[in-house]
């Protein structure tokens, strides 16, 4: 079994909790209060800036030019493509640049990004790849799940979010991360794989806490 599938199987419980969370279901059914989503967009904007820094560690830790380029491209994708989803809602919700500049990450947000950065700093390229994977992969799974709800993709407000995270372009980015981790772990020991599982499950749990933080706002 490939390492990515092992991690995926072990994350099913917490990912199921994420999918069924009222914040996520509110996006899919178009019933989520806009003020909660507005708070989420601001916090996720701050998150993405730190998330990109974890990918930057991939450039530092990479042992060959090809992987360095791939991580560099991933940073560009976060700041240009994924951030475009946020910029759409920043305009829609009339969030000002001053608001973004003055916003502070919540404890859950800061703890999540600090954990990823810490694991990336002290680990190898494998730990970096594992640390960033659950965010993108779980978002893809969530968006694909929500896209099956009747009329969710056509929703005037939340449809853009679901389309963005269930798109072929976003799926390609996630697949790159999955394939990279699998290629890096072909000769990994059981102990090394269990450490990667710990990182993957912990970041998945942080994903749940992030949804809950936004819902409780």
Swiss-Prot record:
It holds the Pfam family TENA_THI-4. It catalyses: 4-amino-5-aminomethyl-2-methylpyrimidine + H2O = 4-amino-5-hydroxymethyl-2-methylpyrimidine + NH4(+). It comes from the Bacteria. Its EC number is 3.5.99.2. Disulfide bonds: none annotated. The keyword Hydrolase applies. Keywords: Hydrolase, Thiamine biosynthesis. Homotetramer. Belongs to the TenA family. H.pylori is expected to possess a reduced thiamine biosynthetic pathway. Some enzymes involved in de novo thiamine biosynthesis in other organisms, such as ThiO, ThiS and ThiG, are missing in this species. The very acidic environment of the stomach makes the accumulation of formylaminopyrimidine very unlikely because it is mainly a base-degraded derivative of thiamine; formylaminopyrimidine is the precursor identified in a thiamine salvage pathway in Bacillus species. This is Aminopyrimidine aminohydrolase. It comes from Helicobacter pylori (Campylobacter pylori).
């Amino acid at each position: 079994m490939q390492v990515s599938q092992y991690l995926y199987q072990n994350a099913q419980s917490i990912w199921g909790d994420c999918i069924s969370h009222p914040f996520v279901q509110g996006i899919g059914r178009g019933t989520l209060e806009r003020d909660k989503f507005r708070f989420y967009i601001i916090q996720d904007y701050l998150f993405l800036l730190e998330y990109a820094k974890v990918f930057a560690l991939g450039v530092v830790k990479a042992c060959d030019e090809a992987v360095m380029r791939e991580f560099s491209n991933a940073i560009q994708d976060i700041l240009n493509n994924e951030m475009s989803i946020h910029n759409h809602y920043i305009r829609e919700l009339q969030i000002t640049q001053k608001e973004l500049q003055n916003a502070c990450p919540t404890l859950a947000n800061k703890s999540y990004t600090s954990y990823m950065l810490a694991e990336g700093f002290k680990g190898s390229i494998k730990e970096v790849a594992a640390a960033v994977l659950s965010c993108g992969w779980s978002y893809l799974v969530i968006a694909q799940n929500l896209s099956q709800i009747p009329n969710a993709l056509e929703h005037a407000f939340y449809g853009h979010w679901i389309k963005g995270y269930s798109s072929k372009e976003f799926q390609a980015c996630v697949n790159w991360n999955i394939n990279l981790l699998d290629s890096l772990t072909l000769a990994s020991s059981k102990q090394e794989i269990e450490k990667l599982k710990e990182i993957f499950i912990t970041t998945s749990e942080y994903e749940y806490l992030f949804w809950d933080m936004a819902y409780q706002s």
